């Protein structure tokens, strides 16, 4: 059975289309968790962000730093956002390294801006938030 050149080219086009679609979907999946955390930062929404907390989360702020449980961490973050009403979150850099995701940005609030670092790590089949740092 002989395959014509035209059929061969058509099969190759279909193959590369599927590979490209697969790559796009997987790259979207990799960044979806951190993008949802960033969306929560933009709104100052501690509940949205806390959905991604690991069992314990490190939260560093200018006046206090500690490791918190999920529920404690959400309250600490909520308190921070209540004291520093969020205007916007501007991304400076976002990346991935060995399955971990990170984002460095500037959180703009009514009380000034905070250089913010978000660190997420792959745990099982999902990304969990392990640390947030706010620096004045």
Model-derived segments and spans:
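Surface-exposed, charged secondary-structure patches
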Residues: 75-113
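Bacterial Sec-dependent N-terminal signal peptides
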Residues: 1-34
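Short beta-strand edge/turn micro-motifs at domain boundaries
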Residues: 113-136
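Short solvent-exposed beta->alpha transition segments
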Residues: 53-88
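Short, aromatic-enriched amphipathic alpha-helices that serve as compact interaction elements
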Residues: 30-45
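A structural detector for beta-sheet-dominated domains
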Residues: 60-62, 92, 121, 135
């Amino acid at each position: 059975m002989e395959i014509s050149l035209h059929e061969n080219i058509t099969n190759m086009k279909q193959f590369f289309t599927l590979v490209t679609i697969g790559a796009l979907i997987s790259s979207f999946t990799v960044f979806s968790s951190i993008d949802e955390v960033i969306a929560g930062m933009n709104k100052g929404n501690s509940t949205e962000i806390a959905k991604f907390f690991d069992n314990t989360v490190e939260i560093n702020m200018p006046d206090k730093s500690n490791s918190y449980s999920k529920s404690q961490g959400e309250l600490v973050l909520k308190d921070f956002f209540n004291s520093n009403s969020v205007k916007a979150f501007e991304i400076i850099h976002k990346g991935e390294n060995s399955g971990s995701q990170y984002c460095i940005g500037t959180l703009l609030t009514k009380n000034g801006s905070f250089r913010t670092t978000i660190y997420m790590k792959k745990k099982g089949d999902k990304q969990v938030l392990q640390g947030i740092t706010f620096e004045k």
